[in-house]
Amino acid sequence: VTVVGGNPSNHPSYNVGSSNKYGINGSTATADVELTFKVGSTYRFTLSSSDMSSHPLRLYLDADKNTQYTTGVTSTSTYTEITVASGAPSTLFYQCSIHANMGARITVTEVDQGLNTQFGGDIATVGPVTLEK
């Protein structure tokens, strides 16, 4: 995950909160990337220590960051990792804990529906988001 420039003027969070976003897999897309995670899998968002201290990536139950999600989650100075537990909410959000509107939705599924196929294999890297199954 890298921190890249802001959202375009047609994005819902344009000029609201952070002008930065997380780039997944080297993405410089115009909005934060929505992800799909499978119950029982482990996913790691890896950032440089300077990015993690300036833009700590955390998981939340809501886009407004009212409730942090911590079940199966480990955060260090260089990564945030989640092992998606059975019974996890169907929707989570990865967000910068400091800046508003810097992050996106994670859809949680019980079954592998061929989602995240761009990651491929049993262990894949998304940006430096490492997906371990």
Regions found by a protein language model. Give the residues of each.
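Residue-level recognition of conserved structural "scaffold" positions that shape functional pockets
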Residues: 110, 127-128
